[in-house]
Amino acid sequence: LPVRGIRPVAAIAPGVSGSTGLTLCQLAGAMVEAVRPAALICVDSLCSTEGARLGRSIQFSDTGLHPAQADHARHLDAGMLGVPVVAAGIPTLMEAEEGADLVVTPRALDSVIAHGSALLAAAINRALQPRLSVAQLCWLTG
């Protein structure tokens, strides 16, 4: 399939801050400074208040991302990064009960993440590459 008109896109998968020693805010700030993107799309798992939503919805927001880290004052948003920030995610956990230090996840979490991430990736790729057909996007992402 010939592919023309691909828009430039950069991506990173920062992982868990405990393994890198850097917070998501630090990594995103450095990336924005180095790449100078038109916008930033942040994908993360989300915490739900209702069990019925776990793995059954996809949420998008143009107000940025509020990482569940100890540094609650640092949010990934346009005010902090200087570019529009779109957050996308799938609710995959919820707090067990008020005041408890436990979280609940779906029993089929691996399946929820595999299917949900594929759907979310397809939607983001389609939004970022509107000139490409679905067949071309499938071919590119293999």
Predicted regions and their residues:
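Metallocofactor- and cofactor-centric catalytic cores in central/energy metabolism, strongly enriched
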Residues: G18
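Short, flexible loop segments at boundaries between secondary-structure elements
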Residues: A70-L93
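Hydrophobic/aromatic beta-strand patches that form the interior of the parallel beta-sheet core
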Residues: A10-I12, A39-I41, P84-G89
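Glycine-rich phosphate/diphosphate-binding loop of Rossmann-like nucleotide-binding domains
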Residues: L1-A11
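Conserved nucleotide-sensing/catalytic segment adjacent to the nucleotide-binding pocket
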Residues: T23
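C-terminal functional extensions of proteins
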Residues: V86-G142
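Glycine-rich phosphate-binding loop
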Residues: Q26-H75
